[in-house]
Amino acid sequence: FWIGRTKGVPVYEKLSYPLLLLSFFSLTQDWNQAYININYVGEFSNGFVPFLNSTFLTSLLCVALVGFINLLHYSKKYDRPWPAQKDLFHLISYGISGIFLVVLYGTFATEISNYWDQLLISTPVYNADLKIFKAIWLLNYSLLFMTALSFLNIIRLKNNTLAILSITLNILVLFAFLTVGLYGLSELRESYLGEGQLVPNEPGFYNISIRYISFLFVAMLLFVSYKYIKQAYVSVAA
């Protein structure tokens, strides 16, 4: 892609797009394989090291490469290979931007998921609370991710299409928290107050305190969503 765009060789850039798709699907396969290795193969039976494993490092490399492609693609310094085909340009723009966001989100979501999965299977006595913690922290991460994306668009990008997309996703994430999240938090509270605290792996105060962490993330997303609808460039009809 870099050669095609910066050196003005359109055929190279066109060839890079199927390679980008292939790399994306290969990465999703790596994520799936990491899940299998933890839950069925027991690859990390001696302990999973968050953010210091081959899957995470590979994902970071993909984030950097796809991010670099996006920077070149949106740079006005270089001409695109099909200047007259605006619809095709927009389609490609949505595609590579979407891939970047999915890879960026999935890189850390996979790490969070794998951490809690490994913790669950490594405990000598089954602890159902760990599955709930996994769901809650994936929701917390989603809330934080959407807050950061929305804030970046408000102060820097100011893109209407991204604004409509992120507002929609903000609503979906908040709905997920109000349904799955609140139910999970209530289950953790019941586990802390109930008979479960009399058995090994007894619930601790973290079962209660995590709700305040989640509420903070919810408040942040609500605030940035409110700021969104006040932006002049945000329009459904645009």
Region spans (language model):
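Alpha-helical transmembrane segments of multi-pass membrane proteins
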Residues: F1-A238
